[in-house]
Design a protein with these regions (language model features):
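Active-site-proximal loop/hinge segments that shape catalytic or ion-binding/gating pockets
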Residues: 2-136
């Protein structure tokens, strides 16, 4: 029996939900994008979250949150998409967030004041032209 997209998403959410318990369970109904407050202001002003390549092209990035080696090792095609996460707390976020002295910033990865954007899981996954990766 083949599943339509809605059925597939319901099954996928149930699988995710089984991995999160208690107060974390609501995460499975959302997708997350974090960035520094300076970039968040630009996102709100423009009403859009652009891909890494597009934000560089439009000169909109106020603060580059990313680790240089992660970006260097990310396929350029993936930089044409907005990076969203299944949970609001990722190793990347934990390593990069917070106001830090320069000697504590590793490979330019710094997100002094993180802002989290939260999106409806199903609405995003029902959009055309979305992609999944299992990492960077």
């Amino acid at each position: 029996m083949s599943l339509n997209k809605n059925q597939f998403l319901d099954n996928f959410q149930n699988i995710l939900s089984a991995q999160f318990t208690g107060t974390q369970n609501w995460w499975t109904k959302s997708l997350f994008h974090f960035t520094d407050i300076k970039n968040a202001i630009s996102i709100i002003e423009n009403g859009k979250i652009y891909s890494r390549n597009k934000v560089i092209e439009l000169n909109l990035m106020q603060n580059d949150n990313a680790n240089d080696s992660v970006i260097l090792n990310t396929n350029n095609e993936y930089k044409n998409y907005v990076r969203l996460y299944f949970g609001p707390s990722t190793p990347t976020q934990k390593n990069n967030e917070g106001i830090k002295p320069k000697d504590k910033i590793f490979q330019n990865a710094h997100c002094p004041i993180p802002i989290m954007f939260v999106f409806d899981f199903k609405k995003i996954f029902l959009l055309q032209n979305i992609r999944f990766t299992d990492g960077n």
